[in-house]
Amino acid sequence: MNVEKLKKMKGKEKIVMVTAYDAPSARIARDAGIDVILVGDSLGNNVLGYENTIPVTMEEMLIHVAAVKRGAPDAFIVADMPFLSYQTSVEKAVENAGKFLKVGANAVKIEGGEEFGELVQKLVESGIPVMGHIGLTPQFVNRFGGYRVQGKTEKNREYLLRSARELEKRGAFAIVLELVVEEVAKEITESVSIPTIGIGSGRFCDGQVLVWHDLLGLNPDFAPRFSKKYANLYEVILKALQEFRREVKEGLFPTEEHSFTDKSKGGVSS
């Protein structure tokens, strides 16, 4: 997969993107035939225990992007630019985005609308592919006053449309639409020539993205309406750990089968 192939999928084949934060997850995503792996700054609240994405640092993101690359070296990987890694200056943004490509990302994702058009253009001119992200942008949640659906007012609808067109004009190869009302997401999708990838933005985007922990049911305390739980791995893992604990406590594990003697043959693997 590459930028040009993704762009050609618009209107022909739905794009599938998932988040992944480590090598084993990336390998599974690759083996499942996922088109794009996003190393999201959602790392913060899904893996690092932060309340939201705002505390996530460049250093943390770089570690996880590199891990994902090792797990799926041939995958198309997009790295989220974390809070304040690109907002302070164009020069700083180019420097930070370049770091992601050096550790294995194929592109970066930037939250924000038309006000970041010049920055997107500079990144693209520097050889860094950019995926835009408009609608609900979690890094700006304090400005929105919470996690609210976007596109409900005419003013906001017009802003989102302008932003999508500006990002396209400046060279973005795709745009994530997050929590945008379905009608507006459809209008945006039809108004630009680059793919839109929706999350909580209805049926008419060119692709869909979900967070790893949401679609696999790894967080029992969070069930967003826009997501779908395709598995309940929290319960699967919980039961496995409970069974392990029980067998150790009762002396049922390890058995002779799991032990070595001076007559054992072969190596560690079975």
UniProtKB/Swiss-Prot annotation:
Its EC number is 2.1.2.11. This is 3-methyl-2-oxobutanoate hydroxymethyltransferase. GO terms for molecular function: 3-methyl-2-oxobutanoate hydroxymethyltransferase activity; magnesium ion binding. InterPro entries: Pantoate_hydroxy_MeTrfase, Pyrv/PenolPyrv_kinase-like_dom, Pyrv_kinase-like_dom_sf. It catalyses: 3-methyl-2-oxobutanoate + (6R)-5,10-methylene-5,6,7,8-tetrahydrofolate + H2O = 2-dehydropantoate + (6S)-5,6,7,8-tetrahydrofolate. One of its GO terms (biological process) is pantothenate biosynthetic process. It comes from Thermotoga sp. (strain RQ2). 3-methyl-2-oxobutanoate binds at residues 41-42, 80, 109. Its main location: cytoplasm. Belongs to the PanB family. Binds 1 Mg(2+) ion per subunit. NCBIfam families: panB, PRK00311.1. GO terms for cellular component: cytoplasm.
